[in-house]
Each structure stands twice: as C-alpha cells, then as structure tokens.
C-alpha cells in the first residue's frame, strides 16, 4: 500500500521514503538479510509507483538495496521516461563528485538525458567534468540523438575539436541544402498545413544549429585562452567557424528571390544566418585578446576562402 500510494496518504516526494524508512526500523526488519527478503516484493511494486515518487525509490534503493541497483535499473528500462525520473535522484548537479555512481548508471543516464531532456546534458557534463562520464559513449548517444552542443563538448574533451568543426560545417551545409529544397517546393507560395509543417521543420533545424554554434563559440574561446593551445590551432578554429557561417549566409543570397517578403522562409533563413555571423564576430572581438589572433590575417583568409569556394545547393 505504501509503495503503490494506495493507503489514502497521496504521498508527496520525500514522504514515501520516510514511511518506508519507518518500516525498516521495526523489529525483525532492521537487519540487512531481513530487508533483502523484501526486495522481490519491492521490485514487484515498481510499476505501480507514481512518477513523482520515483526519486524516493532511488533513495530507498541507495540506502536499503544498494547491491540490487542494476536489477532496479533493468526493471525500469521498459519505460524509459520512468527510468529517467528514477535516475535524476542520482545525478543532482555536483552531487556525486566522489564517483560513487557506477559506470553502468552513468551510461544509462547519458542515454536517457539525450532522449528525455537534452538541454540538461551539457550542464551535467560541465558539473561532473570530462573524466566522470564515458566520453565515447557521450559522443555516440549525442550524435544519434542530434544533441550537437554536447557532442562538440565531448569531442573537444577527447582532443577532437577539429572533428567537432567538421560536424558543425556539415550541420550548417545540410541545413542550407534542406532549406533550398523546401523553398524549391514552393513553401512561400502556399498556406496549407504541409507548407507550415515544412517551415516549422526548418526553424527547428536553425535552433539546433544555434545551440551547436553557441558551443562552438565557447570552445573557440576556451582554446583561445588556454596556454596549451597553439596560436595556429586557435586561428584554425576561428577560421572554421567563421568560414562555415559566411558560406551559410551566402547560401541564402538568392538573386532570383531577392525581393522575397520579409516574412518569407528565405528572408527568415538569411536573417538567422546573419545573426549567427554577428554573434560569432562579437564573441571573437570581446572574448579573445588581439595579441592571441590576428584579425587582419583571419579576415584575409576568409575572403580568399570564400572567393575560391564553389557553393552548390
């Protein structure tokens, strides 16, 4: 009754844990062997425990059934959202700095974060540091679920920052190509539900790109201020980001649609790409010492690169 919240108390978070703790101090249940005998009953009740009380379940497992944690995790895997709610209690920001959570738990947590709450992934990575989680697993899951800011973070911590820039360029160019395909389908000339869905899809992809760019800017700044990064490497990172953005912006200067209305998808795409470029330049100018990177050399290289590029969509 207590576990299934059927005794009329309608537990709020914390109360279920308190009531179970009261049971386990009763005569005959104080010993670990006696409590262990109740584990199968506890496990059989998990599916009926309300979602808001799953953090209490995590506390109960940690205190009374610590050796059976994997069984609980396995039992909950058929309901990924509930498994995510259960795991939240183990990964309060900066709570497990000593590394008590086993790697199995950490790996499942990364997967569930990518699926259920991708915006929390980078804060988790920042809080625990690059040695806490399996970064190869982070890269795999973040790539699968298109959580690009976390993917770039993990690649950088693995010493693969240039690969992150490759991913950024591909993401931007794929977006440009997709946007042109939608435009060629006449989305700006129609007002039906399919056209609206296509517009929304493009807007979502721009939002994903913005998140990825924000992380790319951050990585550029961090490497610019790092004593271990060479000037040549820092220059290359900034060039890669700016070159990608200039190419993206140029992709939407379409002379055949030069007079497109301001609310058209083309105008929106161009506005977004211009804003991204402005953000990159503002970050570069305000965050990187002028002696660290030659702006004149960087912009000269950009102009040359763009003049040599053959951009096809």
Regions of interest found by a model, annotated:
Residues 1-139, 148-156, 161-313:
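Extended non-globular scaffold/tether segments
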